[in-house]
């Protein structure tokens, strides 16, 4: 069934106050659905793996930092496709749209390289993460099988970026919703019935993502939108590839930096004992929802600015940032009030132990208010990326997030070994990042720079 162009969100005309939430909320729902699928898989593997339940959960959990690092890198790369295609649509450059779309589809082939490297380096990578010897066989098995899904995961994310560049955000959500139901169903067959353990969970993930990627590919073949895919045109275009990598690689590194920094923090948390680990894990589940909501406005900012920059509607680019800051701020404030206000009650649903609830609430009170800073720098970063400025926000994130968190864990934490102390690094690093991101926007001032360039060109 072909999609009609009327289903997309018009980013260059109409109300930004209405269109940005219409874009952002399906993006947020897609990310939250992915987290929900992973959470349910963990519950299934923990409850239906017999005597190996705890070991199986540890095996899957020990892979999270590694898989998150890879996924963040490549999902960031897909943002490059989003910006390049959105900008070309704004310029009405259908030739570049076509070349960028078909190049993006083939970029998912990088997933096969990841499979090959993963098969070779699975155990060395897990050893570097200090995975215990008794967990290593299952952890290595899970990673090797999970990596088989990498081409499908990459293809899905590049396809989703293509659809979002033209303002179609519900379709990736619908495809993922179907695959999530399939994933949970397969988990319930492969683990409790067939007793495949961690391999069953990884196989279910691979099948589910293959279905979602295939669904979006078929839609791209049938769509009457400008991003339609024609198999005979599938080729890597050097110009399109260079533009995508120029924006996408720094964005991918920026996302991966968070994963690296969080690995370091998690190692410090682990050193404080099992109770702290359990409390921190429960609170972290709430953070994913909040972060995905805020990040969806950043993605909206990137895409809307990209299209309007291409269409030379620079005033609308600036207004996009303002709208994203206001609406993202409202979402952030609402989430902070609800979670902090009901934090103890929500945490008790994960674990009724009063001590664990109290420890988890320390994390809630430390991190959730700091998401106000996160909202600022995510939207500022998205604004710069929409203008094609991707390296600057990546460098700021690397220095302010990774640098401060590394320093805190290795230089401050050893002298004050408390959970509250390690949690302080979040507001400090996020606040510093937000400050320098605002400075970067004021110094780069892409809208003013664009107008000055156009004025000089006109004068000639």
Regions found by a protein language model. Name each.
Residues 54-65, 139, 143, 202, ...:
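Small-residue hotspots at the loop-to-helix junctions and early N-terminal turns
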Residues 75-78, 145-164, 172-180, 201-216, ...:
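Short runs within selected transmembrane alpha-helices of multi-pass transporters and secretion channels
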């Amino acid at each position: 069934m072909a999609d009609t162009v009327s289903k997309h969100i018009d980013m260059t005309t109409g109300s930004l106050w209405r269109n940005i939430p219409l874009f952002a909320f399906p993006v947020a729902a897609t990310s939250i659905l992915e987290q929900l699928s992973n959470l349910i898989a963990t519950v299934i593997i923990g409850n239906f793996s017999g005597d190996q339940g705890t070991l199986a959960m540890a095996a899957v959990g020990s892979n999270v930092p590694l898989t998150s690092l890879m996924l963040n890198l490549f999902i960031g790369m897909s943002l490059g496709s989003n910006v390049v295609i959105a900008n070309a649509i704004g310029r009405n450059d259908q030739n570049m749209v076509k070349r960028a779309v078909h190049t993006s589809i083939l970029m998912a082939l990088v997933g096969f390289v990841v499979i090959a490297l993963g098969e070779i380096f699975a155990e060395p990578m897990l050893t570097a993460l200090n995975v215990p010897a008794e967990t290593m066989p299952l952890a290595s098995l899970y990673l090797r099988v999970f990596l088989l899904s990498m081409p499908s995961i990459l293809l899905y994310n590049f396809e989703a970026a293509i659809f979002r560049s033209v303002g179609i955000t519900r379709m990736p959500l619908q495809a993922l919703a179907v695959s999530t139901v399939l994933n949970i169903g397969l988990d319930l067959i492969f683990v409790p019935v067939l007793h495949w353990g961690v391999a069953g969970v990884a196989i279910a993930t691979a099948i589910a993502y293959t279905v979602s990627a295939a669904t979006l590919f078929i839609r791209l073949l049938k769509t009457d939108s400008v991003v339609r895919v024609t198999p005979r045109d599938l080729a890597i275009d050097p110009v399109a590839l260079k533009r995508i990598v120029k924006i996408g690689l720094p964005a991918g590194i920026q996302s991966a930096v968070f994963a690296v920094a969080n690995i370091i923090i998690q190692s410090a948390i682990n050193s404080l004992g099992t109770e702290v680990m359990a409390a921190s894990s429960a609170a972290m589940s709430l953070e994913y929802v909040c972060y995905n909501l805020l990040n969806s406005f950043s993605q909206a900012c990137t895409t809307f600015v990209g299209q309007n920059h291409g269409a030379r509607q620079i005033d609308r680019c600036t207004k996009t940032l303002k709208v994203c800051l206001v609406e993202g701020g409202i979402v952030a404030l609402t989430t902070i009030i609800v979670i902090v206000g009901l934090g103890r009650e929500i945490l008790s649903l994960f674990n009724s132990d009063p001590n664990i609830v109290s420890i988890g609430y320390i994390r809630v009170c430390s991190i959730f208010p700091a998401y106000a800073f996160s909202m600022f720098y995510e939207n500022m970063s998205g604004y710069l990326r929409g203008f094609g400025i991707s390296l600057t926000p990546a460098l700021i994130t690397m220095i302010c997030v990774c640098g401060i968190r590394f320093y805190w864990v290795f230089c401050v934490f050893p002298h004050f070994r408390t959970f509250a102390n390690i949690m302080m690094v979040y507001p400090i690093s996020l606040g510093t990042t937000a400050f320098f991101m605002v400075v970067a926007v004021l110094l780069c001032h892409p809208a003013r720079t664009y107008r000055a360039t156009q004025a000089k060109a006109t004068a000639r």
